[in-house]
């Protein structure tokens, strides 16, 4: 899929972390180790159950879910891992496509630098990646809708230009890449949200 913030066609595209997460029982395991945080963790965006479920769904769509483990935050395009979370790795990988996308939300370096500067994010650590992804969601005009109604079909279409694994209104990727179905994403989101709410006793 095109990485977060990508607005160009195939030359900057990326398949979802080398398709490392297929639509199988194991890859769709929504048992979340990526749990809710307390408060805003010093960031702009509070991680409510709805927002965490959204972030987890983006990870699922982009192939970085890894059953909610933190190693999903260290994935580069193609499925390789990087260790230094002090910064975006900015490593160009040539696979089916050529991309330098990295992290749980497959940020391109240019996108990451812009959002990190705007939000004053000092590293590429997981909580900063979460904040940056929510900022991109807000920038696409989908955050308030998801806060109120959950991951609607309309919200998916709004996010399709940001993450090519999300379907447009036609059900296709905005960039001609492999795409998750609306039903698949809605099912994952709903299941994950239920588990997150159960953690809070809601």
Segments the model singles out, each with a brief description of its role:
Residues 1-119, 132-145, 149-202:
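Cell-wall polysaccharide-cleaving catalytic domain and substrate-binding groove, primarily
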Residues 122-125:
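A short, structured beta-strand-centered segment in the mid-to-C-terminal lobe
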Residues 127-129:
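Long, charged/polar, surface-exposed segments that mediate recognition or autoinhibition
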